[in-house]
Amino acid sequence: MLLRTILAATATATAAVTVLLVPATAAHAEPTTTAAASSSTAEATTAEAAAGANPVIVVGGLIGISIAYEPIAARLRADGYRVSIYQLPNLGFGDIRESARALSSYVDQVREATGAAKVDLVTHSEGGLVSRWYVKFLGGAGKVDRYVSLGSPQQGTYVANIINFLGLGSCAGIVACQQMSIGSGFLTDLNAGDDTPGTVRWTTVRTWQDELVRPVDNAALADGASNVLVQAWCPLRIVGHLGLVLDGTTYSVVRQVLAGATIRPNCFAV
């Protein structure tokens, strides 16, 4: 029952094997006061940026189908971005390194189809780790401009450790679950040295109510990333792990990052 609950909650992998494209800085982003709604100037800046922007690939997480990420993809399309959704191979159950190799091929397909030199990655949960492995070890640093992770266990999550502790078949035989355990060999390799390599612009978004990434601060990166805690800006905002891809405030951060605008989450967005 516990495993079913956890797996259902993580139902968050994404996307298509086909390319569905529709035309249309190094400080932590933690404030001391709550931000107000985005100004009309910021909205205009975002719209202008989208017109000539990189293609955006939404990279999903463990267990899920493409449709789970259609809401955030639809928001991006409405803002003028060319968007595709990438579903992890085998629903993300397998080796994250293998998923990263598959993502590498997918990125090349998108670049060829669009003529773009680089893409932007908007990732959720396990998808953030898949994307980081691709950037760090598989040549993605020269092909990715912006990286945004939503609730990705960058330093692991003790939820995976608990499953192991309970003896549920070593994460019930799920390789990716084992790799997301705090202290795993996979995470040791991924986080060794600079955890934000290359010229990629790195941003993470996390929420206090994340029931799957615990401790919550394990969803942040250390070296040169903008790390956004939703409740640092919007203390009354309640957003869970799955809610990060549906939440308006979270999306306001995504669109600001993609537009190269200053990060000021809109606490009133729906």
Where are these regions (language model features)?
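Secretory targeting and sorting signals
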Residues: 1-31
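N-terminal low-complexity, Pro/Thr-rich disordered segments
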Residues: 20-51
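Serine-dependent carboxylesterase/thioesterase catalytic core
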Residues: 54-60, 67, 82-86, 97-193
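Active-site glycine-rich loops that stabilize anionic/oxyanionic intermediates
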Residues: 61-64, 208
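Secreted/periplasmic proteins that engage bacterial cell-wall peptidoglycan
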Residues: 62, 77, 91, 99-102
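Conserved alpha/beta-hydrolase
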Residues: 73-93
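Surface-exposed patches in mature extracellular/periplasmic domains of secreted proteins
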Residues: 89, 93, 115-121, 160, ...
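Helical cap/lid subdomain of alpha/beta-hydrolase-fold lipid enzymes
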Residues: 136-270
